[in-house]
Regions:
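Conserved short loop/turn motifs at secondary-structure junctions
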Residues: 7, 271, 368-375, 385-390, ...
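Long, ordered, helix-rich scaffold segments
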Residues: 310-312, 417, 422-424, 459-471, ...
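Aromatic/His-enriched, Gly/Pro-containing loop or helix-boundary segments
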Residues: 3, 25-47, 86-88, 92-95, ...
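Hydrophobic alpha-helical and helix-loop surface patches within well-folded domains
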Residues: 13, 24, 84, 142, ...
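Short edge-strand/loop segments of extracellular domains
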Residues: 8-12, 72-83, 219-222
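Extended, low-hydrophobicity, Ser/Thr/Pro/Gly-biased non-transmembrane segments
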Residues: 39, 55-163, 168, 184-187, ...
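A surface-exposed beta-strand-loop module
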Residues: 10-76, 99-102, 134-136, 477-485
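Surface-exposed beta-strand/loop patches in extracellular or lumenal glycoproteins
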Residues: 1-10, 111-117, 429-457
Length: 816
């Protein structure tokens, strides 16, 4: 062998030398291929067989792209600008920090040594085992890591402070942050400790590292990153003032911290062999975060709220342009595109469905077997199925392969025919045919299976008693005799199935008459599935709006998220002349529940009810454009400014409503609040409030701030996305995107740019749709994987609904 090839990009390699077992050195001629992200080392003579050492001297730049080894800039408590250096390597960016074999299967032990300014602090995956001085540098040597993949290596250097470590067994758990923010670390540390204990018990294996540090980074592209022993986070996902935060803000911190801790086993200890299997990491971590948080805070009802996440995956997976959970990956851009709702939420939903089908204990036994068998190595989906099969004695591949390796999911239809309950399955799609677009010649998804093996739970009520009937729907149709005194049937009892349900008219009306007897997740699914079949053209929109009248007294915040989400979607579809009618409909649906709850919490009220109050205030003041709610919100916000106590679940809603009705003077006040926010959550509240101001000049001001450095590049793409989805700003935002695309492409993290482009689904008119296609075609923009095709198909679904239902909507909304 006279050639070595490894990954390197944006690096200058000054020297590459191989030292063989006899101490003989051979220098290489180095050729860098930036396009392939590889370095080729050519040697004059054949390298000796046996062990050797490759020594590489290289240089790089601390970039500002939030990937590889990059710089994060922030202001300290005195207002001075400071810089820290951090890493983000997943999926394929370790090669931007050091030459390496940057693929998940090339696991290795990493020995990190950092030479830094003596006044700074450094954190890496393991504990510091030696500290020395070399000239004007402090040299920190860290313990060897476990055998792990390159994307999990991490180091952070800067002015940092940390909490007092809390031991979990022999593992010290600490939170690190920039100076002045340690007061916000207690809640995140509490979650980290609780979830680490839970996972050690659930997995039956000790935590694989020698310490666990959680680090809040001011600039961070993703939500967090599961580097073994040195988990990095956005500040909003780790630092929080528990007393000042809303339930939603606390829940986000708990979910993200638990998710990353779950990865210490699923992902770090056992790693997928290649990026097509990334779901084994992310779906399991998403599933496990729910288990851990639900165990820690059962009153939060996380599995009910998970219905919202499941619905997001169902929305994308109902497209012809969806992909299987496990999908071929050939290039770094394709690997990056795998980090989506299909990998995370669909994957977690399918795991939850399988867990409920097998039983929690058998499922856990299989998980433990999988982790023990493949510890410190790599695995694939077949390895997981084998472990679960050994535990359950079930033919797991036969049941599960179509859920993982084929796109889409079934629509389970249920009807009464001839004294029998008839249950049918077919693939659910929003459009009857795939979207015709300029990239349609690209390879299509694998064909969906004719049928799935669907674990269906039916709750049949007859004679005042409910019984649960479990069936594995493997054929197109199955029939069950109706019991005497039949009253109703709930399909997907418990809400854990990854499929949609379509009831015939009579069965749907029977359920609507029994809403108080349905579980919250069942009511959520009833609304969400009804809206989906409406969007697919299988139910008139007027029937759906009639259905929403039955929920005026609904008290579950997740059900309301489905109701309000559908009204927000309609708001983007209706003709301008019909919008006042839709606003009135929104007020009619939401006002009764807010009137029942009142504007202030009552003694003993649970957190979910408090969050619902805030959600309804926001919806009525913005989507409903209710002048009375806007006036009351302004009064309460003014009282807050004078020092009055306002419930943290209501305050974000007040800020949003005041902005929606606000003028230029109020905009300047909120801009200053954004700049001087005391917590990451407060900063986010005022940042997104800037998008709610409706005057065209203020819309332009906010858009300009997304590219002039005032809004961090980690946040700016999401601000633009929000403005593309808002009716008052979408036109200006779209013109801005077209004009500034090159600037955004240069400034924003690639992940952020992909998410920003999702906002085009808000441009729901035929004219805008044509312009969107024209823009992306002319610019030859590729967002990786099927991302762009999915956005365009979602836009087509919205425009098709508008074209199909506009006349009926106009008549319905005009009626008293």
């Amino acid at each position: 062998m006279r050639e070595i090839v490894l990954n390197a990009v944006e690096l200058a390699i000054d020297e590459a030398v191989v030292v063989d077992a006899a101490g003989r050195e051979q220098r290489a001629v180095v050729t860098l291929d930036e396009a392939a992200e590889r370095a080729r080392l050519d040697f004059a003579e054949t390298l000796a067989t046996g062990r050797g050492r490759l020594r590489i001297a290289f240089r790089g730049t601390l970039n500002d792209k939030l990937r590889g080894f990059y710089r994060s800039v922030y202001k300290d408590p005195s207002g001075a600008t400071r810089t820290l250096a951090a890493t983000q390597f997943e999926a394929t960016d370790a090669r931007r920090a050091f030459p390496c074999w940057d693929e998940p299967a090339f696991k290795a032990v990493f020995a990190v040594t950092l030479a830094i300014d003596p006044v700074l602090t450094a954190v890496s995956n393991t504990r510091v085992v030696a500290e020395t001085r070399e000239g004007d540098r402090k040299v920190l040597r860290f313990a060897d890591t476990i055998t792990m993949s390159t994307y999990l290596v991490a180091f952070v250097v800067g002015e940092l402070e940390h909490t007092q470590p809390t031991p979990v067994g022999a593992t010290p758990v600490s939170v690190w942050c920039v100076p002045g923010k340690r007061r916000l670390a207690a809640f995140g540390q509490e979650v980290a400790v609780a979830s680490l204990r839970y996972f050690e018990d659930y997995y039956g294996l000790p935590y694989p590292g020698d310490k666990l540090d959680l680090l809040a980074i001011p600039d961070f592209a993703a939500g967090a990153m599961e580097n073994l022993g040195a988990i990095t986070f956005r500040e909003t996902a780790l630092l929080v003032d528990e007393k000042a935060a809303s339930h939603a803000e606390l829940q986000r911190v708990a979910d993200v911290v638990a998710h990353e801790n779950a990865h210490m086993w699923f992902g770090d200890l056992v790693t997928m062999s290649w990026w097509n299997g990334i779901w084994l990491n992310e779906a399991f971590a998403t599933f496990m975060e729910m288990l851990a948080v639900d165990d820690w805070k059962p009153e939060w009802q996380r599995w009910v709220a998970f219905g919202v996440s499941r619905a997001a995956a169902l929305s994308v997976d109902g497209l012809h342009s969806t992909r299987p959970i496990e999908f071929p990956v050939r290039a770094p851009r394709e690997a990056d595109a795998m980090f989506d709702v299909l990998t995370y939420e669909k994957g977690a939903s399918v795991l939850r469905m399988l867990e409920q089908y097998l039983g929690a204990e058998l499922f856990r036994e299989g998980v433990r077997d999988y982790l023990r068998t493949h510890a410190f190595g790599n695995a694939d989906t077949g390895d997981l199925w084998a472990a679960l099969g050994r535990a359950s004695r079930q033919p797991i591949p036969a049941v599960m392969d179509n859920w993982i390796f084929a796109p889409g999911y079934p629509l389970v239809s249920v009807a009464v025919e001839g004294g029998q309950l008839v249950v049918r399955q077919q693939r659910f799609t929003y459009l009857p045919e795939p979207l015709r677009w300029y990239g349609a010649a690209a390879p299509a998804s694998p064909p969906a299976p004719a049928r799935w093996q669907v674990p269906v739970q039916l709750r049949i009520t007859a004679g005042g008693r409910g019984t649960v009937d479990r069936l594995l729907l493997a054929e197109d149709e199955t029939r069950r005799p109706l019991p005497a005194g039949f009253e109703s049937v709930v399909v997907n009892e418990g809400g854990h199935g990854f499929y949609r349900v379509r009831y015939d008219g009579d069965l749907r009306m029977r359920l609507l008459g029994r809403l108080p007897r349905l579980a919250a997740i069942e009511r959520f699914n009833l609304v969400n599935d009804a809206w989906a079949v409406t969007a697919a053209g299988l139910m008139p929109v007027t029937d759906y709006l009639d259905l929403t009248t039955r929920f005026r007294e609904e008290r579950d915040k997740n059900v309301w998220s489905a109701l309000l989400g559908s009204l927000a979607a309609l708001n983007r579809l209706v003709r301008p002349a019909d919008r006042p009618g839709l606003e009135a409909l929104g007020r009619d649906r939401a006002a009764p529940t807010l009137a029942t709850l009142g504007w202030t919490p009552r003694p003993g009220e649970d957190e979910l009810t408090r969050q619902l109050r805030g959600d309804l205030v926001r919806a009525l003041g913005t989507l409903g454009n209710d002048p009375e709610v806007q006036a009351r919100a302004a009064e309460l916000y003014a009282a807050h400014e004078r020092g009055a106590e306002v419930d943290p679940n209501v305050l974000p809603a007040l800020i949003a409503v005041v902005a929606h009705a606000g003028d230029e003077a109020r905009y300047e006040i909120f801009l200053q609040r954004f700049r001087t926010a005391a917590t990451p959550q407060e900063e986010q509240r005022y940042l997104y409030a800037l998008t709610a101001f409706r005057q065209p000049s203020l819309v332009e001001h906010t858009l300009a701030r997304t590219i002039n450095g005032e809004i961090r590049t980690q946040d700016a793409p999401f601000v633009v996305r929000s403005m593309l989805l808002l009716v008052h700003s979408r036109g200006q935002a779209w013109e801005f995107v077209k004009k500034q695309w090159d600037t955004m492409d240069r400034l924003y993290p690639k992940h952020g740019l992909r998410r920003m482009a999702e906002g085009v689904i808000g441009l729901a008119t035929p004219e805008w749709e044509a312009d969107v296609h024209r823009f992306f075609q002319e610019r030859k923009i590729d967002l990786g994987g099927k991302t762009l095709e999915q956005y365009l198909e979602q836009l087509r679904v919205a425009v098709a609904l508008r074209e199909r239902e506009s006349a009926a909507l106009s008549t319905y909304l005009a009626s008293p």
